[in-house]
Amino acid sequence: MTLTFVDSWPIYLQSITFVVALIIGIICLVKFCDIFVDASSTIAKKLHIPELIIGLTVVAIGTSCPELAVSVSDSITSLLEHSNANVAIGNVIGSNTCNLLLVLGFSAVFTPIVVKKSVCKLEYPFLLGVSALSVLFVVLFGTGSSITGNYAILRLEAIILVVLMFVYIWFLIHNAKKHPEDKLDEKESELAETKEKDMKLWVAIVLVIVGAAGIIFGGEAVVFGAKGLALQVSDAAHLNHDLAESLVGLTIVAVGTSLPELVTSVVAAKKGQNELALGNVIGSNIFNILFVLGIAGTVNPLTTGSQVIIDAIVMMVATVVVFGFALTGKIKRSGGISLLVMYAAYLTYLIVRTVM
């Protein structure tokens, strides 16, 4: 990995720079994503686009902006440096696993999550399907070499994911029009917040540009900090560099980019609207796979090492376990504790895998 201007700095100063870059990057991603979504929603409303479509597209995709910025940035970096995209793939898999185990776990511990029957019949089976498809793409159809890695999301596979994303958006809009009583309440509440911020069109356009620039900067900063920390840790402890990068992507970066979902779910729990938590997680995980992996893989095929097999399987197992809880109609506190224990066990495994 090329670190350019910090190469000649003292090690301790490099470490501080990487940590600060990572923190500032995550803060920028969270804050500027909010600005981007609010301004984009305002522009859409000024253009008389139905609020339902705004909620199911602009707002939904906006929640995946942090993951997209990080993964695309790492995808470009891997293209320029002929290296693996460990952070890009680790970010998506780690974020989805974090959403399922940490976010839902915390939410259920606060207040048991009530699950609508329609979720188990429509949205969640779709999440199971796209999760399984992504695992198949990475594990069964990946290609590799000594340079690019053992497993990959190829460009054709990424394009398929993007196409499926548009199919999913069409399905959401079609289903919402067919069953208006089942509109996504959480998206409507988010739109209600943007209504209160009645801004002029030119202001909204400027804020969209500012938000997009902030998201790009945040993504670059996160990747710079994450890769720098991974390089330092792997060099200092004589660890496998790919494993160190994967560890950072699956933990620090994944949790950081999942902060919007975590905050939204905890706030919903405190307001007694905990049933929104599962819907937020399902939507976020679907968009992470189809939108983030799809776009990043289209920019440049995403390659990584064989460790991705276990990580992808853990994500799939977490998806199935949560579905099992959801089928009972409620994720109880005991279920939430179980999810948190699973996440703690997975983090322990990641650390042990990296240092062994």
Where are these regions (language model features)?
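Hydrophobic alpha-helical segments, chiefly the membrane-spanning helices
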Residues: 1-356
